[in-house]
Amino acid sequence: MHGRPAGSVMTVEFELDGQKFVALNGGPHFKFNEAVSFQVHCETQEEIDYFWTRLTDGGAEGPCGWLKDKYGLSWQIVPTALAELLLDPDAKKSQRVTKAFLQMKKFDLAALRRAYQGQNP
């Protein structure tokens, strides 16, 4: 029906955190890229570490909380506090946070909070 070898999969349905998805097998002609990514919002450093460790296993770390899993799919592992730190009306605080996270691969929540407060790492 889909012109692929018998037994191959054309679509897969899955659910993440209550959100339903359908993935289409585009074959070798369509590769994953950063235009499509999943964001995982984490409350704690432990959650950041958990998802980072598991998703980079067989994959690759990227800058600023980005990574690719072993299938080449892009993910962003983001502390929920980041928005609050970046949207502070005090521009100096948000600039320090931005400067700090631009140097990170995996987000370090304690380091972001120190930057926000103007404390040295």
Regions found by a protein language model. Name each.
Residues 1-121:
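Glyoxalase I/VOC metalloenzyme domain signal
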